[in-house]
């Protein structure tokens, strides 16, 4: 089982979108499915996964950007945002964020 590591940014933002229960469901799902998100081209291995929010329906989902460090047994949650707010974060920004957090590629 992989360990979840939250970036300071993710830790600050997730409460804007999820209940504690939503957060727990996601934290239980991702370690078992680390490659579930779409690979973001040019990002150095970052992935984007779509996830729902309680009571928000199909259109009220969020996007979570993360990187899987399979060799070290961890998944790093980089950021979270509402669907439609930031459709695409530039790959070079994601790559830089992952590098700063010690992503191993």
Model-derived regions: residue spans:
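Small/polar-rich, solvent-exposed N-terminal microdomains that initiate assembly or binding
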Residues: 30-41
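Basic/aromatic recognition patch in beta-strand/loop cores that engages polyanionic ligands
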Residues: 40-79
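Amphipathic alpha-helical interface surfaces
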Residues: 6, 22, 26, 58-61, ...
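Enriched for short, Lys/Arg-rich terminal
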Residues: 68-105
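Residues that recognize and position ribonucleotide moieties
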Residues: 3, 47, 87
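Sequence/structural signature of beta-propeller domains
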Residues: 20-25, 32, 45, 50, ...
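Arg/Lys-rich, positively charged N-terminal/basic patches that mediate binding to nucleic acids
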Residues: 1-21
């Amino acid at each position: 089982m992989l360990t979840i590591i939250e970036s300071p940014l993710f830790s600050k933002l997730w409460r804007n979108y999820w209940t504690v229960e939503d957060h727990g469901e996601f934290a239980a799902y991702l370690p078992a499915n680390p490659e579930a998100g779409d690979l973001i081209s040019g990002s150095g291995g970052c992935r984007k996964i779509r996830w729902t929010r309680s009571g928000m329906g199909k259109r009220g989902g969020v996007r979570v950007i993360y990187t899987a460090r399979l060799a070290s047994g961890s998944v790093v949650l980089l950021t979270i945002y509402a669907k439609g707010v930031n459709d695409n974060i530039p790959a070079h920004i994601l790559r830089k964020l992952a590098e700063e957090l010690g992503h191993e590629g």
